[in-house]
Amino acid sequence: MNSFSGSLEKAKTLTENNAPMVDPFGRAITYLRVSVTDRCDFRCTYCMSEHMTFLPKKDLLTLEELDRLCSVFITRGVRKLRLTGGEPLVRKNIMSLVRNLGRHVQSGTLDELTLTTNGSQLAKFAAELADCGVRRINVSLDTLDAQKFRQITRWGDIDRVMEGFDAAQAAGIKVKLNAVALKDFNDAEMPELMRFAHGRGMDLTVIETMPMGEIEEDRTDRYLPLSQLRADLERNFTLVDSDYQTGGPARYVTVKETGGRLGFITPMTHNFCESCNRVRLTCTGTLYMCLGQDDAADLRTALRASDSDAYLSAAIDEALLRKPKGHDFIIDRTHNRPAVSRHMSVTGG
């Protein structure tokens, strides 16, 4: 991991105009995903091992430091900010960070503050999230079958997630459902998941499993190309391509029979790198310029080097010079190893 090597005086000069962030390929960086914790109250089999070793709490940035970092990114042109984890809502006092970041939505400097959650804590926090300016959230749900849900999450309770859906929608928050497509697990269930989501006014986005982190099972056995899933769905549904966008990588279709939207995120079969507008920040202050590569920049050192944001802003600029054109994801069937060694819960899903 690289740390910023420039001088403080140089940093002050660089940041006077708060110039928008643009990578070497001309892509404007307007979307920041922030993993506020690597901890989670589920242990989804495709995401992490059951007996995970989590980061020591002393290594985490404080919530105040995360707020400062996010605010610098917003000053530099970020318009959408997503809190992730792990499970973001299990971090102690997380709502203080959400409330502080909400001031940017209120002032108009941030278009959207949102989060991705497993739904387990939504019933507790939905009303407060809405009060802080959160208008949309993504909830991860791979099956509607209670027994299979317990199997895939190991620790999860689907009834709590359903209560979370109710609470979020009652609070006026728009919910999008995310489902990881898993061969021979939930592929036959996708029509039911789609009808469930669309029946409640929610979009559904399906995601190809990504080769990140060591897990107990062989993820190649579960890999399902979404081109195959789409072909299966088109036997019974009319899928009409849509130009609808949310600022993320999903490509959407409208399902004629339900009237709802269905999104596809395809990092393996059809990558979305050419339009990448995002970077990812971890709870330790590490900036990943690409989800599918291990190159990273240490922003914690720059953050703590000075009370001025100049040094930090210059460190961000230096990191963005290394943002690659595309990721290195590949399902390695020969060596049975992940393309990226870190878990998604560390990077932020």
UniProtKB/Swiss-Prot annotation:
Listed GO biological process terms: Mo-molybdopterin cofactor biosynthetic process
What is catalysed by this protein? GTP + AH2 + S-adenosyl-L-methionine = (8S)-3',8-cyclo-7,8-dihydroguanosine 5'-triphosphate + 5'-deoxyadenosine + L-methionine + A + H(+)
What keywords were assigned to this record? 4Fe-4S, GTP-binding, Iron, Iron-sulfur, Lyase, Metal-binding, Molybdenum cofactor biosynthesis, Nucleotide-binding, S-adenosyl-L-methionine
Enzyme class, broadest EC rank: lyase
Q: Where does [4Fe-4S] cluster 1 bind?
A: C40, C44, C47
Q: Which cofactor does it need?
A: [4Fe-4S] cluster
GO MF annotation: an example: GTP binding
**What does the record say about how the cofactor binds?**
Binds 2 [4Fe-4S] clusters. Binds 1 [4Fe-4S] cluster coordinated with 3 cysteines and an exchangeable S-adenosyl-L-methionine and 1 [4Fe-4S] cluster coordinated with 3 cysteines and the GTP-derived substrate.
Enumerate the residues binding S-adenosyl-L-methionine: Y46, G86, S140, M210
Which pathway features in its UniProt record?
A: Cofactor biosynthesis; molybdopterin biosynthesis
Q: Which CDD domains does this entry report, sorted A to Z?
A: Radical_SAM (cd01335), Twitch_MoaA (cd21117)
Task: Tell me one Pfam family matched here.
Answer: Radical_SAM
The family annotation for this protein states: Belongs to the radical SAM superfamily. MoaA family.
Functional note: Catalyzes the cyclization of GTP to (8S)-3',8-cyclo-7,8-dihydroguanosine 5'-triphosphate.
State what protein this is by name. Answer: GTP 3',8-cyclase
